[in-house]
């Protein structure tokens, strides 16, 4: 999965025609509701969160978001689960049990619960100049943070339909003062620290990054067919917009 959401003992509406044994159990306070579970309960929660994210972009940012932007925003705000079954495969993000983690809206879009959370984005589905047309092409963006809070970055794109990844983009981050670098999904197992060749979502998460200016580079490592648009989301204690600084 890309994300997970609560799916155990969820209170749901009960059909008057369905026998009680089709559900997990009765809801004592109201006979029109029952307890249910599984992906049938988790999926509506994710859909509701996606609707809130879309509403945020339309109403607060005056932007019609692409599917990739909704996906990047939701994944960017996830919370990593540490229970044994959540990390049974491996304790790195992403894994086969929880993807990039559990949806957590307080970390997803600006809200009163997280007053220091700022969000900047690039959504290139209507910007031809920021769409990849060949392998080896790259775009660079710059932003600044004040420090003292976490930093999260998520890149997502809608790939061509196929059994495996077709257009491979890669995410790189650099702190301009120190020169320290990070790559997308660098916490995958085996410790290879190489660009991810398999996923159409890449994240960088820093718990206590130094203040200053940062450079993001997105590269088309392998582009079978273009143009390829993408969505980029950055959240944290941002002190500047996410500005385009290089197109090549």
List the predicted regions and their residue ranges.
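Active-site-proximal structural scaffolding
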Residues: 3, 39-42, 46, 63, ...
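Residues that flank catalytic or metal-binding motifs in active/ligand-binding sites
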Residues: 6, 70, 149, 167-169, ...
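Noncatalytic accessory or regulatory domains flanking protease catalytic cores in secreted, cell-surface
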Residues: 28, 34, 90-96, 170-233
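Acidic glycine-/aspartate-rich tracts in secreted/extracellular proteins
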Residues: 8-9, 79-82, 158, 178-179, ...
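Secreted peptidase-domain scaffold signal
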Residues: 91-167, 224-226, 231-248
């Amino acid at each position: 999965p890309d994300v997970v959401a609560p799916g155990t003992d969820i209170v749901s509406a009960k059909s008057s025609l369905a026998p009680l044994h089709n559900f997990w159990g009765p809801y004592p306070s109201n006979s029109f509701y029952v307890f249910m579970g599984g992906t049938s309960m988790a999926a509506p929660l994710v859909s509701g969160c996606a609707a809130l994210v879309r509403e945020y972009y339309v109403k607060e940012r005056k932007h019609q978001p692409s599917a990739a932007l909704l996906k990047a925003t939701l994944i960017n705000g996830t919370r990593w689960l540490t229970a044994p079954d959540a990390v049974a495969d491996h304790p790195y993000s992403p894994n086969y049990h929880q993807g990039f983690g559990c949806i957590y809206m307080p970390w997803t879009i600006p809200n009163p619960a997280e007053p220091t959370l700022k969000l900047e984005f690039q959504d290139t589905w209507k910007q031809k100049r920021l769409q990849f047309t060949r392998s080896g092409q790259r775009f660079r963006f710059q932003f600044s943070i004040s420090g003292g809070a976490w930093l999260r970055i998520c890149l997502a794109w809608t790939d061509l339909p196929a059994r495996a990844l077709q257009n491979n983009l890669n995410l790189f981050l650099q702190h301009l003062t120190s020169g320290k670098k990070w790559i997308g999904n660098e916490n995958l197992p085996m410790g290879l620290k190489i660009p991810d060749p398999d996923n159409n979502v890449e994240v960088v998460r820093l718990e206590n990054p130094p203040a200053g200016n940062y450079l993001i580079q997105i590269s088309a490592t392998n582009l079978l067919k273009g143009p390829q648009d993408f969505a980029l989301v950055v959240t944290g204690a941002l002190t500047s917009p996410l500005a385009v600084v290089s197109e090549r």
